[in-house]
Amino acid sequence: MAVLLCFMCLPLLFLVFAFLFLADGDLTLMSKRRVKREEIKDKVIWITGASRGIGEVLAKQLASLDAKLILSARNEAELERVKNQLTGKYAPNEVKVLPLDLASGEDSLRDAVNKAESFFPDAGVDYMIHNAAFERPKSTALDVAEEALKATININVLGTISLTQLLVPFMLRRGRGHFVVMSSAAGKVPAPGQAVYSASKFAVNGYFHSLRSELYQKGIDVTIVCPGPIDTSGSNGMTSAGKKEKRLSSERCAELTIVAATHHLKEVWISDQPVLAVMYIGQYMPTVGYWLMDKVGGKRVEAAAQGGNTYSPGLLFGNKKAN
């Protein structure tokens, strides 16, 4: 009987493994089939890092869902470019451009929050999408210059937290608010070659999960998004051999991010394989996950230095410059 049951379970196991292999998000995220448009329509959504990459694509998709948008980044000209490309009920004419440097200090951030809260009559910020981040080319943990270390922490952690602290009181007065935090797979598992960036994302994950636990009963929600390698305008994913690393498109990442936010998911993972599998292993079998990272860590740093594929499974078998 036991043998018969095993054979009966094989098709189910095959389907599960096939799903995991083909999926570009975690199981909970993949179970949500569509964006809940009613959660977005006519809502005020503030996006940092909106001048390029995932932030730009999020702006385009949210505008098409009839959201009221506030776009922030340091480059005002690029924000205007993005604004002029948007279409929707409120776009482009009613899209607000709000230049912002997360490392500019509390007074500057407070001024930005006050402006964001006043842009739309009788409507404050409903969604705050923390997308802005500072990331340097891959290097060893010991080779990060002090300037890059400070910039990473100031923007990814301190500036993001300060902006949140200044915005939350407005949300609490309304009894609602939702933070969507663009974290990283590097905030879930070790990221050899990205030690400081990884540290900043682990910090952000810890802060925002704690914030949600403290304020959820008061109407404040948090969705943490952990993407793996994404194909953005600032990163073409090409190796020195001219071969492209496997990266998920910005459009797909943005789409799944909006799905996660509108379904009020707590944390989601978005990535192609093998990074998604590594995240599962790190979450549910951490000892194995650390063993894997220890096995490939040094080779991954060397692959980055040589222009190789830093996401190739071949690194596990000693191929430093895997294609």
What are the roles of these predicted feature ranges?
Residues 212-274, 287, 291:
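SDR active-site lid
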Residues 139-141, 145-150:
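Substrate-binding pocket helix/loop in short-chain dehydrogenase/reductase
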Residues 88-106:
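Rossmann-fold cofactor-recognition segment
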Residues 164, 200:
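Active-site helix of classical SDR
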Residues 184:
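Residue(s) in the substrate-gating loop at a strand-loop-helix junction
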Residues 51-52:
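Conserved glycine-rich cofactor-binding loop
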Residues 65-82:
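Conserved glycine-rich Rossmann-like NAD(P)H-binding loop of the short-chain dehydrogenase/reductase
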